[in-house]
């Protein structure tokens, strides 16, 4: 299915999406993407519907053909301080701030958003499977976050982040129980607190 613009007009439409919200470790990433009105690619879809190879194939296409794109990052420490919902909004704000042009309309994947500088925004549940600018943002956010987890894995291979990317897999939780938490774990997340709590016989 070919994805569309939200409104067929001349406004600079920017799609925003995040990656890593449900993870136990690592930062949350967001991307903001302004695509040309005529942009089209047969593979473009929600990043969760694509293989890893397809996502990395699309990333340079998006980056080279877009009008502008930006990446925003919020650290685990910031997530613990302000909570993951606010951290997701902050990551999107930081991504928008990286754009070379000010957007005229924001498309947000999800049902909530903290308004950014009075730019009109539309929250769309499942927007990454419907609108191409959000789909493109989902691909950039996902691939750049995956890259960051691979880098962190070099210093903390015991957690298996090259496989689980920080998500709460059984192996990841088991590693937290065995080795304790790292500086990159989100200490306020229930999965981390539960896994790090000693078990009693």
UniProtKB/Swiss-Prot annotation:
Q: Which GO terms describe its biological process?
A: DNA replication, removal of RNA primer; mismatch repair
Classification via CDD domains: RNase_HII_bacteria_HII_like
Q: Which UniProt keywords apply?
A: Cytoplasm, Endonuclease, Hydrolase, Manganese, Metal-binding, Nuclease
Cellular localization per UniProt = Cytoplasm
EC code? 3.1.26.4
Detail the disulphide connectivity of this chain as listed in its UniProt entry. none
Q: Which domain of life is it from?
A: Bacteria
Quickly give the catalysed reaction: Endonucleolytic cleavage to 5'-phosphomonoester
One GO cellular component term: ribonuclease H2 complex
Q: Which cofactor does it need?
A: Mn(2+); Mg(2+)
Q: What is its main location?
A: cytoplasm
Please list the residues that bind a divalent metal cation. 17-18, 109
Which residues belong to any copy of the RNase H type-2 domain?
11-201
- Entry note: cofactor: Manganese or magnesium. Binds 1 divalent metal ion per monomer in the absence of substrate. May bind a second metal ion after substrate binding.
Gene Ontology MF term list: manganese ion binding; RNA binding; RNA-DNA hybrid ribonuclease activity
What the entry lists under Pfam families is as follows:
RNase_HII (PF01351)
Q: Which InterPro entries match?
A: RNase_HII, RNase_HII/HIII, RNase_HII/HIII_dom, RNaseH-like_sf, RNaseH_sf
This chain's function reads: Endonuclease that specifically degrades the RNA of RNA-DNA hybrids.
Q: What family is this protein classified in?
A: Belongs to the RNase HII family.
- Which HAMAP family would you find in this protein's record? RNase_HII_B
NCBIfam families of this UniProt entry? Answer: PRK00015.1-3
Q: What is this protein called?
A: Ribonuclease HII
Q: From what organism does this protein derive? A: Porphyromonas gingivalis (strain ATCC BAA-308 / W83)
Q: What gene name is listed for this protein? A: rnhB
